[in-house]
Amino acid sequence: MNGRIHQNKSGSGPCLLGAAPTYVGLSSPYFFSLCLTSANPPYQVMDGGSKASATPVYNYFVEQAKELKPAYVSMIIPARWYSGGRGLDSFRESMLHDHRIRQLFDYSDSNDCFSGVDIAGGICYFLWDEKHDGNCKVVNFHNGAKYETLRQLDDNDVFVRYGQALSILNKVQQQTTEFYDSRVSSQKPFGLRTYVVPTEDGDIQLRYNKGIGPFKRRMVTSSLDWIDKWKVIMSYLTYDHAGRADKDGKRRIFSTMEVLPPEVVCTETYIVIDTFDSKAEANNLLQYLKTKFVRFLVAQVTTTQHISKANFTLVPVQDFSKPWTDAELYAKYGLTVEEIAFIEAMIKPME
């Protein structure tokens, strides 16, 4: 662990945070109480794949630090745990429901904390106080601005990164009966891995990472009823490098999106957002996904480079017999001038 453990001899008074660390062997005749565990632990171990597929280990250091029963724990770790996944689900639940976390400092761009270092999803550090049981002060640093809120980390079913977004989300939830995480496909929507390529001939077509080509219907193993539908698909990778905003502090979120006609399927390079009987409805959904409103909602729960159905848990399903614009969506959910400005400041236009 790249950090410090501060200890004090029992009966010698309160520990001095920042004092020189004392390391005690098992043969020590003194009883020591642990006061503060602070660290910048290792973040991940490589599993033979890319960095994006490496296995996180920082969660184990946090959990072990708490097991030592210190008065305080403070660590700086990747912010990817906000949305769970990749072995982080139980850690996420533990952190969000732990009301002893007194402060959480969040950097959506890791460069603002570690110059020249790209960490997908950003970075955060926290103060865990063994005697604290209440709200957490959440401080967000974004594009040179600082936002501070006092709240419970488990106030919502999902962890919302920016406190300023909570009022927007509450308004959306009050008027919504179905969210898009109930419709978006899982990975491998048609059971076809990324390495699957078109065949020499076929009765349908395959959209893969290098284009489109002939394919055999009998090779499709999942979602057979979607083959003859109009489909809206999206790349499973986000557009923003390491989750970083552009020079103006704005994010695009989505990368490749398109409408696939009947008799066209795709590999797991893409996920299916929804299917329709008509081309018009599919095009209206595509336009909806391009709105700043939708991409802002997705951004609240996107701290990795991957897009899945879980990222659409805040996106309301609409009537797609008509197209939707940002102005119409802002009006439908009664957003204030300040709330609209917050969205516009975070999300870039998308044609």
Model-based region annotation:
Residues 110-337:
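C-terminal substrate-recognition regions of SAM-dependent nucleic acid methyltransferases
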Residues 46, 82-83, 241-243, 350:
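Flexible loop/turn segments at secondary-structure boundaries
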Residues 343-351:
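Short, amphipathic C-terminal "tail helix"
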Residues 1-17, 27-192:
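Signature of N6-adenine DNA methyltransferases within the class I
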